[in-house]
Amino acid sequence: MARYVFITGGVVSSLGKGIAAAALGALLQARGYRVRLRKLDPYLNVDPGTMSPTQHGEVFVTDDGAETDLDLGHYERFTGRSATKTDNITTGRIYKNIIDKERRGDYLGATVQVIPHVTNEIKDFVIEGNDDYDFVICEIGGTVGDIEAMPFMEAIRQLGNDLPRGTAVYVHLTLMPYIPAAGELKTKPTQHSVKELQALGIHPDILLVRADREIPEAERRKLSLFCNVRPSAVIQALDVANIYDVPIAYHKEGLDDEVLAAFGIEPAPKPRLDPWEEVCNRIRTPEGEVTIAIVGKYTGLKDAYKSLIEALHHGGIANRVKVKLEWIESEVFEKEDPAPYLEKVHGILVPGGFGERGSEGKIHAARFARERKVPYFGICFGMQMAVIEAARNLADVSGASSTEFGPTKEPVVGLMTEWVKGNELQKRTAAGDLGGTMRLGAYKAALKKGTKISDIYGSTDISERHRHRYEVNVDYKDRLESCGLVFSGMSPDGVLPETIEYPDHPWFIGVQYHPELKSRPLDPHPLFASFIEAATEQSRLV
């Protein structure tokens, strides 16, 4: 029977509930438990697929094609368990399900209300499909007091009574700010946050308190007294140098012990944290440093590239080097020479994106990497721009462009109208909806034997996650290959190009998929490990 941990947040947003949930999941896993993590998002969008990357951050795609919150990326990276579409739900999805049921007549004429219909839908989501797990950790998005989060708070309050006694624990993450003028940490914001949570009928079992310095014992006792939790359940969550220090830091503070004690599991199995200690040791004591330029469109909000950033650091862990990132807005290269920006970097990465803005700058970056023999990694849009660059400057297709940018006589990149998913033919039109209509989720690809990318994978058959509606036009394949660009990977039916490379280049690879979504600190993705290895070699030449 599964036990449930509900994680809420207070005082301010962006405190790191997702990291806290993921770290707790990793600690319970290290003790041999089977763990599932789920995210409840209060916003009214059905999913984050159509939300601006500069507002919401990255859209994390699962194997089964769900567009989800970026916290699911943290869950996967810390636990190694692949998330599914049933691990994330939004208020928009909840209401859509309820309205569909009402239209079908499922409620038999009843007046549909927030309580019980919305809360029941949330509760059904939380408890469904958990028979194979020992612990289910549910993160509730937003902050206590947000009007959008009220139905979720009510639902998890009810679950405390619905579930068998002793199978639900509430963890509240708060902030303890330091006031320089007073020279001390303040408990009052946490007191008020807990008071508001208690007013909703939820009494936290554990307080996880963020702070930028050690919390004095007297202040912990004060929080224990005023917030009605055990002194041992006031856990300090101090700032750390990198997020992969968090599991060990929380273990030292006793978070996992306190959670297990709250469930009455004593004595608990000892955790095996050696792999995490090795990761942290590699990060703390690098044997070198490489600089990677990320030429992107959404560089104003780094969360738009969260999985990408982490995957690059995983590549650094694999090679025992520190990875320094240089962020460059691609529009800069449409007005300026890229050379001064790129001459000193050891690798260039052009990530995914949408729309014409900044595309020419990405094309210039690809050309610089090709001509100067700098390691280049093009992901999704980054692969498409590298192919357009090759078409223009190697194959003499002067008008080469993408139909995403408007009508063109040379559609080297075009809208996908048909592709195969499993045994079904998927069809799309330019006039269709934006939400949920891309080529989403895991698809297989066949790599050409003897190519660099097949050597990196150690296989010719791979499966990777996709999120795109435009694709390199296979009609240009022969023309481009005659100029030296190799289409090293295709969809199994041979219709959709998946990977490209230059055999005479130290490391120039483009992929239509998103390998960053499957990289883990304990298991770095081979492409990122190889890219950073190539950048390390380049660093010895610059």
Curated annotation (Swiss-Prot):
Binding residues annotated for Mg(2+), in chain numbering: D71, E139
PROSITE patterns noted in UniProt: GATASE_TYPE_1
Catalysed reaction, written as an equation: UTP + L-glutamine + ATP + H2O = CTP + L-glutamate + ADP + phosphate + 2 H(+); L-glutamine + H2O = L-glutamate + NH4(+); UTP + NH4(+) + ATP = CTP + ADP + phosphate + 2 H(+)
Residues annotated for L-glutamine binding in this entry: G353, F381, G382, M383, Q384, E404, R469
InterPro entries linked to this entry: Class_I_gatase-like, CTP_synthase, CTP_synthase_N, GATASE, GATase1_CTP_Synthase, P-loop_NTPase
GO biological process: 'de novo' CTP biosynthetic process; pyrimidine nucleobase biosynthetic process
Activity regulation: Allosterically activated by GTP, when glutamine is the substrate; GTP has no effect on the reaction when ammonia is the substrate. The allosteric effector GTP functions by stabilizing the protein conformation that binds the tetrahedral intermediate(s) formed during glutamine hydrolysis. Inhibited by the product CTP, via allosteric rather than competitive inhibition.
Family according to the record: Belongs to the CTP synthase family.
Function: Catalyzes the ATP-dependent amination of UTP to CTP with either L-glutamine or ammonia as the source of nitrogen. Regulates intracellular CTP levels through interactions with the four ribonucleotide triphosphates.
Record's miscellaneous remark: CTPSs have evolved a hybrid strategy for distinguishing between UTP and CTP. The overlapping regions of the product feedback inhibitory and substrate sites recognize a common feature in both compounds, the triphosphate moiety. To differentiate isosteric substrate and product pyrimidine rings, an additional pocket far from the expected kinase/ligase catalytic site, specifically recognizes the cytosine and ribose portions of the product inhibitor.
Name of the featured protein: CTP synthase
